[in-house]
Amino acid sequence: EDEVPVGAVIVKDGKIIARGHNRRMQNCDPTAHAEIEAIRAAAQRLGDWRLDGCTMFVTLEPCVMCAGAIAQSRIDTVIFGAFDDALGCAGSRANLPADPNVGGHAKCAGGLMKESCAEVLQRYFEKKRKE
């Protein structure tokens, strides 16, 4: 797949309940980010859009759309790898998942395996520039 290599998992009670990865190109859908895909899968699995008690792990800091969806889905914690200084909205540019003004209450922490996550993204974009 020729997608930006971002992946997300959602965990509840110590178990992975959903996974997602970017599928924008594959689905011709600008909303098919890893976080959105994982949120949709978790909601289906739990039979509830409220993802209270869940933690999301994602390789790249969520964008504004994904950060808003995280807030609206009531995920408790977001842990991400690489920071996105340009578009990140879970700490870099804003912190929407934690902002009560948009329904957020999540704790956000970035930098988990940030070098590895950033390297995967950097390699992908270097390859794309050569094509």
Residue positions per predicted region:
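Zinc-dependent deaminase
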Residues: E1, M65-E131
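Glycine-rich oxoanion-binding loops at beta->alpha junctions
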Residues: I36-A43
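Immediate flanking context of iron-sulfur cluster ligation sites
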Residues: D48-L60
